[in-house]
Regions:
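A shared catalytic/ligand-binding motif for oxyanion handling
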Residues: 1-186
Length: 186
């Protein structure tokens, strides 16, 4: 059994962006697509043409003028059937994490459970408390996975990759790149 799962920061999930995601899912045979930074408010399940479904999780109301936070999981018809077979339960961990379970059958008819998580990490400008809360929430979401479940996490980790040059000197107490491998920070 082989499935395709994509993950992407959407920087605001407008109708045109969602249409593009749905079109790509159909063309490429994508099972599920995790989206972060959707800027959508509230929790909802939207049904779309062809049996596709979008599950949204976000703050109850806008936290800024342009929008912020919000995660979604878009399912193709097979994934949606598996979501329903597993009980159609959405689990929310803070405002940044959405988790669902999908039940499928393998080639021998045995049940397979997939725990699918969409997560959006705080950026470097967020408070230490927000970062710690996210880490706690993500740990809870991951630990909610049963022993025999397949865990898939689609996440915008807000990571910044770079490297230290031989001539670089690190200031005490400042988080910088940890090694010499990576890309030059831009």
């Amino acid at each position: 059994y082989c499935i395709k799962v994509y993950s992407q920061n959407s920087r605001g999930l407008r109708a045109t962006n969602l249409e593009e995601v749905l079109a790509n899912m159909k063309i490429q045979g994508i099972f599920a697509w995790c989206l972060q930074e959707t800027w959508r408010c509230g929790n909802s399940i939207e049904k779309h043409e062809g049996g596709y479904v979008c599950i949204h999780h976000g703050p109850k109301e806008k936290l800024s003028r342009r929008g912020s936070l919000g995660v979604s999981i878009v399912l193709n018809p097979t994934a949606y059937s598996g979501f329903k077979a597993a009980g159609s339960k959405c689990d929310y961990y803070g405002l940044r994490i959405l988790a669902i379970t999908i039940k499928l059958k393998d080639t021998k008819g045995k049940d397979i459970f997939i725990r699918l998580i969409s997560a959006y990490a705080p950026h470097s400008g967020c408070t230490d408390e927000e970062k710690e809360q996210y880490e706690t929430d993500l740990s809870r979401a991951i630990n909610s996975c049963e022993d025999n479940d397949i865990l898939i996490v689609g996440s915008d980790t807000n990571a910044s990759l770079s490297c230290i040059k031989e001539t670089d000197i690190q200031d005490a107490g400042v988080q910088r790149p940890v090694g010499k491998f990576g890309c030059e920070h831009t």
